[in-house]
Amino acid sequence: MRCELLDYELPEALIASRPPEERDGARLLLVDRGRRAGEVEHAAIRDLDRYIERGALVIVNDTKVVPARLFGRKRGTGGQVELFLLHRLDGAPAGAEDLGGGPQESAPRSERWRAMGRASKPIRPGSVLDIERDGALVAEVLERAEDGVLTVQLSSPAGLSVAAAIDAYGHVPLPPYLGRGDDASDRERYQTIFARVPGAVAAPTAGLHLSPGLVERLRANGVEIASVTLHVGLGTFQPVTVDDLDLHPMHAEVYSIPDATAGAIAGARARGAPVIAIGTTVVRALESAADPARAGLVQAQSGETRLLIQPGYRFRVVDALLTNFHLPRSTLLALVFAFAGRERTLLAYRAAIDAGYRFYSYGDAMLIRGVDAP
């Protein structure tokens, strides 16, 4: 796909810098793949239960966003520095030991991480960074790769586990296009109500819309809800800079499909019910685990995916998609093009812009459903 086809114009005023007052207070654009491109309906997220049929299977992402931005100073010079944690080198998700409530005594007080660093001068191996003046968290730079990614040893001399120190002193990694720093409210609102498994450095944004009340109404209407885990990585912010999308170096993300969810999908297929993905991250996880021998089913598995979905891709698992409005020149927009068609998607985006919908992570959403028109 030529990447110029991923462009569209968006007024800056429509970029949502804050979430709606209520979690389910966003607007909802309804797009039917079986209708003529450009035909849309305007609705509200709080009424989502009206548009999902009884017996449907809704699948959410239960990843938990880690406060991955750390601010401190270089020991000796006092220069300001920022670290953006990417992942632990032992492969464990960020802060897995006790951000989820595990015992402090068993959690490690020293961990090796990959991180991005930013300072007025390059951060070199041997540098020691004091994240907090009281010594609660210290980062020693061990290596610097050619691409600038650092290997750091995090330790907590103050007696906290590293995970607890990150949780206490880290900042929510808001997308750069929001144009602001995080505040206390982002700890709750940049996290879905399903967040359970720490490891993401960006939120699965479609899931941000689902409130406890909305979920309760869905279940009362006979809708089944299951979960997968896909830890959203920093690459989700990476713009497409190549001319041909096939040449884009797709980032890797860790995912897991539990047995219960694989079974729920099999049950939905048996009763002829649709599988509805809450967000593009769920789509990537499910399609990465699609069972090659059994149409429409998935294999319960864990792994790493670099799946790049673009027009021409044949979806094997997902029947409908709730998703936010995405950045131009992004792989997320390419995925939506693949699911709904480029013309239909761009006409829907134009309708949303004309109606003043809010875009991106804290913005409004669209529900894409219906059988794809020939």
UniProtKB/Swiss-Prot annotation:
Major subcellular site: cytoplasm
Entry keyword Signal: no
**UniProt enzyme class:** transferase
Q: Which reaction is recorded as catalysed by this protein?
A: 7-aminomethyl-7-carbaguanosine(34) in tRNA + S-adenosyl-L-methionine = epoxyqueuosine(34) in tRNA + adenine + L-methionine + 2 H(+)
Compartments, as annotated in UniProt: Cytoplasm
Q: Does NAD show up as a keyword for this record? A: no
Q: In which pathway does it act?
A: tRNA modification; tRNA-queuosine biosynthesis
Q: Name one GO biological process term.
A: tRNA wobble guanine modification
* Alphabetized PANTHER family for the sequence: S-ADENOSYLMETHIONINE:TRNA RIBOSYLTRANSFERASE-ISOMERASE (PTHR30307:SF0)
Q: What is this protein called?
A: S-adenosylmethionine:tRNA ribosyltransferase-isomerase
Originating organism: Sorangium cellulosum (strain So ce56) (Polyangium cellulosum (strain So ce56))
Q: Which gene encodes it?
A: queA
